[in-house]
Amino acid sequence: MLRFAVIGHKAVSTPDFSLNDMPGGAGRMDVLCRCINASFFLSHDLRRDTECFLILKGGEQADPANTVTLRFSGEKIKSLNPDERSAGALIKKALVTIPEEEYQRAAPGISIRKSGLAKLLEEHPFAVLDENGEDIRTAETLPENFILSDHQNFTEEEMELIKDLPKYSVGPRVLHADHTIIIILNEFDRRGEQA
């Protein structure tokens, strides 16, 4: 199972956002929607052995008390279409569910809980995508879990949490998070490994 965790630094964690204003009023939710689509879509199918975690930090005034994690499972997800609005609608629907400490089903293939990066790192051995990391094309083996940031850099607190994790790069240039996910999945495909 491949896993991608994307931190949405300004992403709202309540359902009261407009699907017509995901870049602004929803805190760059559009970036996260593209990451969901990149994680799952093939030309005529979905990647069923992939999960995508979105860590929504609660909007402009990010507050750890408002941070939620959404887990999207390719094995069970329904009603996902290859456009940002479809992914945004699924996020909005999931956020109607009041999060608790453990994952709760919010929709088919989507779970929500009240937590952030620290708890996710306790559960899975993640690697960080960083332009200064080991190149995925020359790495002998690749990890199955990757952390990415949205359009912003990791915060100091996040850097402290991930400082000892292995770092990998998809190349010499900084790319959008969704493009990076596609390149990683392509590398797994080229190696003939399940993704």
UniProtKB/Swiss-Prot annotation:
Signal peptide: none annotated. CDD domains: TrmY-like. This is tRNA (pseudouridine(54)-N(1))-methyltransferase. Its main location: cytoplasm. It is found in: Cytoplasm. Its EC number is 2.1.1.257. One of its GO terms (cellular component) is cytoplasm. It comes from Methanocorpusculum labreanum (strain ATCC 43576 / DSM 4855 / Z).
